[in-house]
C-alpha cells in the first residue's frame, strides 16, 4: 500500500514542558532549545506534519499545554499532532479547539483502553493517534510504559490489534531499543505491526542518517516516517530527508521551491 500513497515526513518534537530534548533509550535526555523555536524552524521547511509530544506531562500529572497549541496553530501551515498529559475527552476537545489537528494518546490508552473508543466515537478516528512504545523481549515485542520504565506483559501484536479495533486512526510506533541509537528503524517491528493492521503506521526511533528513512516504508511497510533527534542539529535537515526519500523512489510530496538533487550526504549522513 505504501507505494500507492504519498509517504509523509513527520518531525517529532520531544519536549519536557516547553524544553525540547533529544532522547536516548528513553533514559537520558539532552536539552537543546525552546519548543516555539523548533516549531518555527519546521513550519518553514519541507514537512508534511509535525508531532509535539510532552513526555513529562503524564509523569508530572500536568494537563496538556493548550496555550502552546494555540500559539503553534497560528504559526503552523501543516497538520499538527499533540501528545502529553491527555487524560479526558475535555483535554482532547480543548486541544482541537486550540488548533491541533490530531492528538496522540499513550499512557491513558494503557490505563484505560476504552478511552480510545470514547475518543474516536466523539471526535472521529481521524483525530486519534495511539502512540505505542515497543521493546524487544526475546523473540517478541512487549509494550513499554515510559512513566516508570516498566516492560508490561502485553504483546505489542495483541495491543495494536486492540488499538485498531477500538477506533484509533493511526499508530505512532516507537522502538525503545532504537531510540537515539542512530542505527536506523527496527524494521522487523515495523513490518510486524504494519502487516497486521489496516490503519496507517508512523515509524519512529533510531534514525541517524537520512538515507535510513526509506527502509521504514520499503521494508517496514509504514505510511509515514518520523524522527526526532536528527532533525534538531543540522541545517536544511527536512529537505535533505525528503531528498533521500525521493532518491529511494518513494512517492513523496515535493516543494516546487526546492532543488532536491543538490542535497547529497557526506559519510556521516549530513547534507552538504
UniProtKB/Swiss-Prot annotation:
CDD domains, sorted = HisF
Pathway stated in the Swiss-Prot or TrEMBL entry: Amino-acid biosynthesis; L-histidine biosynthesis; L-histidine from 5-phospho-alpha-D-ribose 1-diphosphate: step 5/9
* Alphabetized GO MF terms: imidazoleglycerol-phosphate synthase activity; oxo-acid-lyase activity
Enumerate the catalysed reactions.
5-[(5-phospho-1-deoxy-D-ribulos-1-ylimino)methylamino]-1-(5-phospho-beta-D-ribosyl)imidazole-4-carboxamide + L-glutamine = D-erythro-1-(imidazol-4-yl)glycerol 3-phosphate + 5-amino-1-(5-phospho-beta-D-ribosyl)imidazole-4-carboxamide + L-glutamate + H(+)
- What are the alphabetically sorted keywords of the record? Amino-acid biosynthesis, Cytoplasm, Histidine biosynthesis, Lyase
Q: Which residues participate directly in catalysis?
A: 133
Q: State which Enzyme Commission number(s) the record gives.
A: 4.3.2.10
| Entry-linked Gene3D superfamilies | Aldolase class I
UniProt lists the family membership as follows:
Belongs to the HisA/HisF family.
Self-association or partners: how does it assemble? Heterodimer of HisH and HisF.
Q: What is this protein called?
A: Putative imidazole glycerol phosphate synthase subunit hisF2
Q: Which organism is it from?
A: Vibrio vulnificus (strain YJ016)
- Gene for this protein? hisF2
Amino acid at each position: 500500500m505504501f507505494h500507492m500513497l504519498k509517504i509523509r515526513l513527520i518531525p517529532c518534537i520531544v519536549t519536557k514542558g516547553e524544553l525540547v530534548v533529544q532522547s536516548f533509550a528513553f533514559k537520558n535526555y539532552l536539552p537543546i532549545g525552546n519548543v516555539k523555536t523548533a516549531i518555527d524552524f519546521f513550519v518553514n521547511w519541507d514537512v508534511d506534519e509535525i508531532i509535539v509530544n510532552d513526555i513529562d506531562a503524564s509523569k508530572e500529572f500536568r494537563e496538556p499545554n493548550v496555550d502552546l497549541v494555540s500559539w503553534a496553530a497560528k504559526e503552523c501551515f501543516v497538520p499538527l499532532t499533540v501528545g502529553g498529559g491527555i487524560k479526558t475527552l475535555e483535554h482532547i476537545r480543548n486541544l482541537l479547539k486550540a488548533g491541533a489537528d490530531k492528538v496522540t494518546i499513550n499512557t491513558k490508552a494503557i490505563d484505560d483502553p476504552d478511552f480510545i473508543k470514547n475518543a474516536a466515537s466523539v471526535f472521529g478516528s481521524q483525530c486519534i493517534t495511539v502512540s505505542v512504545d515497543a521493546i524487544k523481549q526475546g523473540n517478541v515485542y512487549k509494550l513499554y510504559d515510559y512513566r516508570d520504565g516498566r516492560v508490561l506483559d502485553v504483546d505489542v501484536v495483541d495491543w495494536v490489534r486492540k488499538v485498531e479495533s477500538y477506533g484509533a486512526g493511526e499508530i505512532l510506533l516507537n522502538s525503545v531499543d532504537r531510540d537515539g541509537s542512530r542505527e536506523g528503524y527496527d524494521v522487523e517491528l515495523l513490518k510486524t505491526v504494519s502487516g497486521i493492521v489496516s490503519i496507517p503506521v508512523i515509524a519512529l526511533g533510531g534514525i541517524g542518517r537520512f538515507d535510513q528513512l526509506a527502509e521504514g516504508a520499503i521494508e517496514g511497510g509504514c505510511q509515514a516516517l518520523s524522527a526526532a533527534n536528527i532533525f534538531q542539529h543540522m541545517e536544511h535537515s527536512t529537505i535533505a530527508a525528503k531528498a533521500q526519500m525521493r532518491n529511494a523512489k518513494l512517492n513523496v510530496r515535493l516543494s516546487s521551491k526546492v532543488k532536491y538533487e543538490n542535497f547529497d550526504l557526506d559519510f556521516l549522513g549530513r547534507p552538504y
